[in-house]
Amino acid sequence: ALEQLEIHAPAVIDLLHQLNDTGCCEFLCEPYSHGLSSLANEDCFREEVIRQRNKMKQMFGKEPKVFRNSSLIYSDDIGGLVASMGFKGMLTEGAKHILGWKSPHYVYHCNQAPSLKLLLRDFKLSDDISLRFSNSDWAEYPLFADKYISWIDALPQEEQVINIFMELSALGMACLLYTSPSPRDMRRS
């Protein structure tokens, strides 16, 4: 995707460099082709990850420390492999059918490599923005920052890690305007 942006949307690359220059963000690493090599071929997976890591370092001057697999696919075997490549953390899906009674709002660890921290996506809060935000048939439409923040604020106090993941393409102009007050509004009293 980075090469496509360089060719077809260099202004986006410029914006990513500006974001990088703030020192307030970290870019993730994922398989270069965004494929499913983690499920089929360990050597291919390693090559894909190394290729993407090198591209990120070449573009932004830093090696990513956190990994995001294609479609947030995770298993302890994949986690162990990711940890063996030096990553400190991994993003994955907080799927209710896997978590059961557990909450995605904690930092978990890989069973095979306990040093690898797992950050789980809150699928409902993420999808409320990425999938339902502009759906006028949705019961919560229109969604404003204060309502969204109230949902987060209503979570148990001990659940301090709220991971909202979405594709960059989900952020249209209306969504960007919606999020602008969020950092200030997110401060808990």
Task: Report the location of each language-model feature.
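Catalytic domains of cell-wall/extracellular-matrix polysaccharide-remodeling enzymes
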Residues: 50-105, 171-180
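N-terminal accessory alpha/beta regions
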Residues: 1-7
